[in-house]
C-alpha cells in the first residue's frame, strides 16, 4: 500500500488546538480520521511539524476530514 505524508506546522495550528499538548493533538487527529472516515493513520511530531501518514488512495477523504477539524 502506498502512503502519503502530510506535514503541518505546529505554529500554524488553529487556536482550538493546544500547542503545549502535541500528543493530545496527534490523538485528536488520529481519532477524527478513524471515527469520521475509517482511516487508519500514523502521526508523529518534532519541534516544528506534525506528520500524518495516510493511505494515498484515501487522500481526498483525509483532506475532507482535516478541513472539517480546521487543520487545512
Question: Residues of each region from the PLM?
Answer:
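Short glycine-/aliphatic-rich beta-strand segments at the starts of folded cytosolic domains
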Residues: 1-20
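Generic structural motif
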Residues: 1-3, 34-43
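Short amphipathic alpha-helix segments
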Residues: 14-38
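Residues in flexible loops and secondary-structure boundaries
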Residues: 16-18, 49, 60
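Short amphipathic alpha-helices in soluble, non-transmembrane regions
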Residues: 24-29, 61-71
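Short Gly/Ser/Thr- and Asp/Glu-enriched loop/turn motifs at secondary-structure junctions
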Residues: 43-49
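Helix N-cap motif at beta-to-alpha junctions
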Residues: 53-61
Amino acid at each position: 500500500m502506498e502512503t502519503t505524508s502530510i506535514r503541518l506546522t505546529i505554529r500554524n495550528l488553529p487556536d482550538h488546538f493546544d500547542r503545549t499538548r502535541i500528543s493530545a493533538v496527534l490523538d485528536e487527529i488520529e481519532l477524527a480520521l478513524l471515527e469520521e472516515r475509517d482511516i487508519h493513520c500514523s502521526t508523529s511530531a518534532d519541534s516544528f511539524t506534525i506528520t500524518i501518514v495516510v493511505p494515498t488512495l484515501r487522500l481526498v477523504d483525509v483532506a475532507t476530514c482535516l478541513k472539517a477539524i480546521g487543520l487545512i
